[in-house]
A protein has these predicted regions:
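Catalytic machinery of carbohydrate-active enzymes
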Residues: 1-143
Length: 143
């Protein structure tokens, strides 16, 4: 990433272990953009998990019961918050609805290896590379 970002929002709504793993991305972003404001959006029940993270400036929470219209409104409100970059580390229906309302902000999305994961769990066929790691995969959108 060669661009200078001043304000970055990371989206990851669940689950607890995945949210903890995404904090490695926060560290990477702070390394490359030490002066950037880095905010995090997650489900309200997971917000306390991140509240004392030294590299996260603000935590935005979403209620698990928020429907389509509420999520669209959240996306519209993000437009008003002056972010330079939104990184979707969940790639879920919820994050796609929110991102669909975001305009004039650069968006990066983590591709999910759904087919590989399905084959691994259902048929015990591992199509992941030998050096695959979740931590490395989380960094992919930053390349």
């Amino acid at each position: 990433m060669k661009t200078k970002f001043r304000s970055i929002l990371i989206l990851r709504f669940s689950s607890i272990g995945d949210i903890v793993q995404t904090t490695s991305v926060v560290g990477t972003l702070k390394f490359y953009f030490p002066d950037a404001i880095i905010d995090f959006m997650t489900l309200s029940k997971f917000a306390p998990l991140l509240k004392d993270h030294k590299k996260i400036n603000n935590i935005h929470s979403v209620n698990i019961k928020d429907g389509y219209l509420k999520l669209k409104k959240i996306g519209l409100n993000i437009n008003k918050l002056d972010y330079d970059l939104v990184i979707d580390l969940h790639n879920s229906t919820r994050s796609k609805i929110i991102l669909s309302s975001i305009r004039r902000i650069k968006k990066l999305r983590l591709p999910k290896p759904r087919w590989k994961r399905f084959n691994l769990f259902m048929f015990h066929l591992n199509f992941f590379s030998k050096n695959f790691s979740v931590k490395t995969r989380l960094q992919d959108p930053l390349k």
